[in-house]
Amino acid sequence: MKTSLVLLTVLLLGGSSAGAMAAATPEGAQRLTAALQAYLTAGPGVVTVTPAGDAYAVKIDAAPFFAKIKEPGFSASVTPFEFTLADQGGGQWKFDQDQPIAYSFKAEGTLDMNCKISSIKGTGIFDEAIGGFASQTVDLTGMTCDETLTEQGKTTKIGISIATMHVATALTAAGAGADGSGKLTLTDFKETVSTAAGETAGSPPMDFTLAAPSLSEDFTGKGLKIRASLELVAWAVAHPGPDAVKAAQAEFKDKLRAVLPVFQNISAVVSMDKVTVGTMMGEAGIDKLGITVEANGVVAEGKLREAFTVDGLRLPQGLIPPFATDLLPSHFTIDFNVSDFDLAAPAKLALDNLDMSKEPQLAPEIEAQLTAAIMPKGSVSIGLGPSEIVAKLYDLKAEGSMTAGPMSMPAGRATITLKGLDEVMAALQAAPPEMGMQQMAPMVIVAKGMAKAGADGTLTWIVESTPQGGVLVNGVDVTKMGGQ
């Protein structure tokens, strides 16, 4: 888990004076305690380290932190975090954890949260050279969290439960950073949201339930600047307050530069099966939901991609009118991407010109240069990857890209294909007259007339922009239609 990674990294990176110890000793425990206390800026009682054979038993207790919070009506508690460390030599440490966890937070009148994990079992090998776990597995069971939020006279109750979760990760050194991969799986996920009626009229109660028997996520990271990031955190802890940071801003900026680009690339693929959503109107469902996310870090080749795939979409009975039943998509894939932007250049420009002793810290002319640095071509590219919507009556596909920027005319090209337009039109014509669906007929007729028809009845539209701001559909400038 992230908490174990941070605590262990602080211990090893911050407490290097502890040395590489083959056996646990009282002296080693004292050094580790002092190192952790210094990096957590905490007093006695927060960190306890004791020899336990060839390992050290470590306990981190957050109670002294919470005791310093004097806000009226606030209370918090967290089970002390416990684990063991055993020196493996060569800058590697074996990490083991086996405990339940419970935590609660309360801010009177606004928040009341109570969560617990029946069991956390984790083991891994922490590598000082990487600043993270070369390998790690974590198993959690019996996770529940109940939260009550009160805002503007409305009370919302949120409940989350997960039967089991398994996480396995691996990291390898790669230059000044690390490459990593991992997989997360969980079972019996359920979330309930219940909102009471508000004090004002027109605010009825609402209840929702989201459930999935299984979820999996595969994730990768390239060029992760883990060690540099944690060294920045340690530096910030050692320089509390804005005055301390301003006094050492040159060093601070060097630490920030060392963290860049944060990562070269990260990606994640999430899959959920048999998703159900319970609402006051009935139950909706998805047989399979897929989400893909990919992004580059603070690099010159900026990139962001998100894709969604839904199979077996179902809506509550009675929600869709009979004429539209066969228009409801059973499958769709939407794939968006953004590219041709630069994050490295503006980051360098900002750091090179940042002066925390002045106000504003960045001169206005530098702020104006940042936009140009982000878009060296004057625009970004926005793409629609191969996307599709499939229903019983039709199959719609689309793909294309466009460029857009503050100083340039949008330009792009897209290809759209549709099979089943006549069937769609027949379904719309069958709608009750009061719904006004028949009014769409002229537009459908025009669209069909502009399409190129294939042998199988598939219609194709190639949509392009012109430098003058026009729009061509299969070569016809639609902006000049109708006498314009």
Task: Show the residue positions of the predicted features.
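Gram-negative bacterial Sec-dependent N-terminal signal peptides
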Residues: 1-22
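Glycine-rich, small/hydroxylated-residue low-complexity segments
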Residues: 23-484
